[in-house]
Regions:
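Conserved hydrophobic/aromatic beta-strand scaffold that supports enzyme active sites
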Residues: 134, 182, 218-220
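Short, extreme N-terminal leader segments that mark the start of a protein/domain
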Residues: 106-154
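Glycine-rich loop/turn
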Residues: 52, 58-62, 67-70, 140-198
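Conserved NAD+-utilizing ADP-ribose enzyme module
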Residues: 2-117, 122-125, 178, 190-293
Length: 293
């Protein structure tokens, strides 16, 4: 059975909104996802649960309703249904009303600054002009040599079952997630954290993220432009993701490389991308300052 509802959950018809007591009597199959709406640390998907943080809980904005709808539409595409849970029944009913009128909400404009995540102390939110993909120096060499960003499935060339069962899949992501290139907002630190985590083979500590911080290589894209990519998808969790591959020459805006990696990476960079490369010194005090350079 799925995790117990804290207050109210919407289940697909004919159940409708049920209470925690009613939920305890129900069973759910493995092809359903749970959307939990609340005041969490961040928005993320973890072990079959979409934790949707609201910037001003219990109020929910049109944009936030849009992202919930996008998540449901993406999951539906891959045969998964969604239940929705929220402590506040009024918030839940507002979201359900938005889902009924999804076409109106899917056109809600993206704010210039998203304040649901406040991990960045400088901007106090996510700046939405750009999205980026951050990677390690070894992976950057492979990317430059093939001229593309590739999904994990295409880059690794192993069965998807192998990717699903790896320890690095701590979030228990389903198979289709590995078919996409993941993109974060331009000033997001999550990509660098993940690169360090995989390099260290453990979660980075405060020292790793400050005086011991080693930034990855960042590939920046203009958000509005990349939305027009024929394989782009908005899944409600990330700003967007792109299926299979992104050809750099066609889409990349800037590539930011730590200066200390210049000698290693420059021989591998195609001439067609040289004018889009920026080298920066890592003279910042921590990971958050680095994302602002």
């Amino acid at each position: 059975m799925r995790a117990r509802c804290s207050a109210f959950r919407y289940c697909p018809s004919p159940l409708g909104i049920v209470t925690a007591e009613q939920l305890d009597k129900l069973d759910f199959d493995g092809d359903s996802m749970l959307i939990k709406i609340g005041d969490f640390e961040c928005t993320e998907v973890w072990d079959g649960v979409f934790y949707k943080k609201l910037s001003n809980y219990p109020e929910v904005s049109d944009w936030e309703i849009r992202t919930i709808i996008e998540f449901m539409e993406y999951e539906k595409k891959y045969g998964r249904t969604c239940d929705i849970e929220c402590d506040n029944e009024n918030t839940l009913r507002t979201v359900l009303d938005g889902i009924k009128r999804k076409e109106a909400y899917l056109s809600a404009p993206c704010p210039k600054l998203l304040t649901e995540c406040t991990a960045c102390p400088y901007r106090k939110g996510c700046v939405t002009d750009f999205v980026c993909h951050t990677t390690s120096v070894d992976n950057a060499i492979k990317i430059f040599e093939c001229g593309k960003l590739l999904s994990a499935l295409n880059a690794r060339q192993v069965p998807v079952e192998t990717l699903i069962n790896e320890n690095r899949n701590a979030a228990n992501d389903p198979a289709d997630y590995f078919e996409y290139i993941m993109l974060a907002w331009g000033n997001c630190q999550a990509g660098d954290r993940l690169v360090m985590e995989r390099s260290l083979e453990r979660f980075p500590n405060d020292n790793d993220l400050s005086i011991g911080f080693n930034p990855g290589v960042r590939f920046y894209f203009q958000y509005e432009k990349l939305l027009s990519h024929p394989s782009s998808v908005c899944d409600g969790v990330l700003p967007m993701k792109v299926k299979d591959e992104i050809i750099l020459e066609d889409w990349v805006y800037k590539i930011v490389i730590p200066t200390k990696l210049k000698a290693i990476l420059e021989p591998h960079i195609p001439n067609s991308l040289m004018d889009r490369v920026i080298y920066i010194d890592n003279d910042c005090k921590d990971i958050c300052a680095q994302t602002e350079t």
